[in-house]
């Protein structure tokens, strides 16, 4: 089946009003492949502003994180309702930087994912292995463990997009080869089929998220299980348009 190509831009802790305006206006004015779904994830203070700038229907806005409660005494957190209230439709959960720096474990990420989905936003669920885990040959065990935690809490995956991000490739300039990525994406899809059924496995989009850029994105073009990219640093640059158009 044909899965809609998906490109997410994770701005991380980068951006100002002026730089975000420049990024969005570049997309507004560019000729984008109309068959691609694009999601921009700026820092939380700029969600509202980014939503106000977007002019293309294929481009929507997502948050980089959300808490697992609707409201309350949780200083510094943002709720899913607040994210939705300003017009965002997606949230990134499970990113390796959240796992590493903020000690978010598989269980917490699963709970946050289930809650976000129940509140009506789409989830970009990040999974991936560290360099040590890759060297130890445990990549599949790691990503299957991360997925299983979410599978235990989420039965409807229609609003989940998986982003496989080899942690050793993030921000390092290193990237998995397209062949490596295809092999792991295929294994992830087989795991989903085993746990959730063939239909869910075939419908769930699996993105590659390790140092994708304007030059290497096109090399993934013929890989059937790579359904798009979660882009970090390159989403802040003009080459983001090239990544979006890498299938056309």
UniProtKB/Swiss-Prot annotation:
Keywords: Gluconeogenesis, Glycolysis, Isomerase. Homodimer. One of its GO terms (cellular component) is cytosol. Belongs to the triosephosphate isomerase family. Pathway: Carbohydrate biosynthesis; gluconeogenesis; Carbohydrate degradation; glycolysis; D-glyceraldehyde 3-phosphate from glycerone phosphate: step 1/1. The active site is at 95 (electrophile), 165 (proton acceptor). GO terms for biological process: gluconeogenesis; glyceraldehyde-3-phosphate biosynthetic process; glycerol catabolic process; glycolytic process. It comes from Zygosaccharomyces bailii. This is Triosephosphate isomerase.
């Amino acid at each position: 089946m044909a899965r809609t190509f998906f490109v997410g831009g994770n701005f991380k802790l980068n951006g100002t009003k002026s730089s975000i305006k420049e990024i969005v206006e570049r997309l507004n004015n560019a000729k984008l492949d109309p068959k691609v779904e694009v999601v921009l994830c700026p820092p939380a203070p700029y969600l509202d502003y980014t939503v106000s700038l977007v002019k293309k229907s294929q481009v929507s806005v997502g948050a980089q994180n959300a808490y697992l409660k609707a409201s309350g005494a949780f200083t510094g957190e943002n709720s899913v309702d607040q994210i939705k209230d300003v017009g965002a439709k997606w949230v990134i959960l499970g990113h390796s930087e959240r796992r590493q720096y903020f000690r978010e474990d598989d269980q917490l990420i699963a709970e946050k994912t289930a809650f976000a989905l129940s509140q009506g936003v789409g989830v970009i669920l990040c999974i991936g292995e560290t360099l040590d885990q890759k060297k130890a040959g445990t990549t599949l065990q790691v990503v299957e463990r991360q997925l299983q935690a979410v599978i235990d809490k989420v039965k409807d995956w229609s609003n989940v997009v998986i982003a496989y991000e080899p942690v050793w490739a993030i921000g390092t300039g290193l990237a998995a080869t397209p062949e490596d990525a295809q092999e792991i994406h295929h294994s992830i899809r087989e795991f989903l089929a085993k746990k959730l059924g063939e239909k869910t496995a075939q419908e769930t989009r699996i993105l590659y998220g390790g140092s994708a850029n304007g030059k290497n994105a096109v090399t993934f073009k013929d890989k059937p299980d790579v359904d798009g990219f979660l882009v970090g640093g390159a989403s802040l640059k003009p080459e983001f348009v090239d990544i979006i158009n890498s299938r056309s």
